[in-house]
Amino acid sequence: MDLASLRAQQIELASSVILEDRLDKDPPQLIAGADVGFEQGGEVTRAAMVLLKYPSLELVEYKVARIATTMPYIPGFLSFREYPALLAAWEQLSQKPDLLFVDGHGISHPRRLGVASHFGLLVDVPTIGVAKKRLCGKFEPLSAEPGALAPLMDKGEQLAWVWRSKARCNPLFVATGHRVSTDSALAWVQRCMKGYRLPEPTRWADAVASARPAFIRWQEIQP
């Protein structure tokens, strides 16, 4: 595994990330969520992608792709491991979204190329990274109140918003992926909340990927 080459690719790709709002439809009509996991001891990569109507946030389509994992887990290079399965799920969608939420980092990455940015560049779609853990940067401690907010900073640059979406829950790290500004990324995440820790696009993607009860109930009521 030539990490120097991958690192150079990350730096080059990161220079092409668009950090401002460039949505083709604003407001969007369809919003997608994506979640990636691994099965069979990491041998299989599973990507779930869901489509939701906006602003109702009604789930209208889902796809799950499973492919052989193409590279081992290497911290800082996760997007190279995840994007092939994401692309496989993306290509199965009957319609393409106007905005995509990805469970993972956007520019809040040491080389400014988390999976949300990498995939957004790959398919040229506006993306937002919604991560559950910090990868780099620092932020001031948040109060315990829901809605508490702080910038995630690294070397004088804001990489994300750290936002406590729900009481008694760890905060989310909301970042530009591609073609969405940092402030707009947070605003879109906030618009897509329905009382859970995660915004609806990534919550549904996780529910589909893991066959959670919410998804099973949804399947049962479909005509």
Curated annotation (Swiss-Prot):
InterPro entries hit by this protein: Endonuclease-V
UniProt xrefs under Gene3D superfamilies: archaeoglobus fulgidus dsm 4304 superfamily
Catalyzed chemical reaction(s): Endonucleolytic cleavage at apurinic or apyrimidinic sites to products with a 5'-phosphate
Swiss-Prot/TrEMBL keywords: Cytoplasm, DNA damage, DNA repair, Endonuclease, Hydrolase, Magnesium, Metal-binding, Nuclease
Entry-linked Pfam families: Endonuclease_5
Primary localisation category: cytoplasm
Superkingdom of the organism of origin: Bacteria
Function statement: DNA repair enzyme involved in the repair of deaminated bases. Selectively cleaves double-stranded DNA at the second phosphodiester bond 3' to a deoxyinosine leaving behind the intact lesion on the nicked DNA.
Protein name (database record): Endonuclease V
Natural source organism: Enterobacter sp. (strain 638)
Name of the gene encoding the protein in the UniProt record: nfi
